[in-house]
Every structure is written in structure tokens, then in C-alpha cells.
Amino acid sequence: MQEYEIRIVDAFTDRPFAGNPCGVVARAEGLTDAQMQAIARELNLSETAFVFPSERADFRVRFFTPLREIPLAGHPTIATMYTLAELGRIDLSAGAKRVMQELSVGVLPVDVERAADGRVRVVMTQAKPEF
């Protein structure tokens, strides 16, 4: 059986056990929809992110709640990009990078940088809501 590394990452904080937790599977190749849903249900966090290679962007990311897949999520995007930067999968040697992530709603930009103190900073922009 294939093994997958699952991280629990706290977004919006610089301290452990604070912020908003999210599951992140940084290399999800080979997982089926049913397996991703089972992992999200088992973790029982508000969202779990699964990262895949993409032909249209730097990464393809899918988000699952314990009950279903969702098209876009804020704090999981931040947790995912932080994780990919920490794993060295986002090159921050120039200090900052605009990363393109493919989601079911399209390709969206995320800005990732390494601050002078060494911490990773992630900024995402979303379209204005329509009511």
C-alpha cells in the first residue's frame, strides 16, 4: 500500500496549536476521490488540501471538508503554500514568488515570500463576492 505524508498546519498564527488548522497532503498523486474524502473525514478538520502536479499552473490543489469537495478555500490555500515553501517545492531564493494554483474554479495566483526573519508569508487575492 502506498504511504502518504499528511501534515496538520495552523494558518494565521506563528505559534503551535493556535490559528486555524488544515490538513495538507503535499504529494497526493495516486489518491482516488474516495480516498481523499476518507482522509478528510478521518482528520475531521474544516478542510484538507491535496496537491497534485498541473499542466496549467505550478500546482493543482483540491480541497475536501469531512463531507465533500469544495472549489476554493482561503486558509487551506495559505496552509498549502506555506507547506510547499517549507518543503522546498516553491523556490524562494529570490525572496518572493507568485505561485499559480489550479483549482476547480480556475487558475488563481498566490504570492509567497520568505521574510527577513526566515518565516514564510503567504498572500492570496480573491474576487469580490457577488450577492
Spans of features found by a protein language model:
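Anion-binding (especially nucleotide phosphate/pyrophosphate-binding) glycine-rich loop
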Residues: 35-70
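Short Gly/Pro-enriched turn/cap motifs at secondary-structure boundaries
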Residues: 12, 40-42, 101
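N-terminal, positively charged, Ser/Thr/Ala/Gly-biased leader segments
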Residues: 1-18
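Short beta-strand-to-turn element immediately C-terminal to the catalytic PLP-Schiff-base lysine
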Residues: 24-27, 51-52
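Generic N-terminal amphipathic, Lys/Arg-enriched alpha-helix
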Residues: 17-25
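Acidic, low-complexity central loop/insert segments
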Residues: 58, 64-131
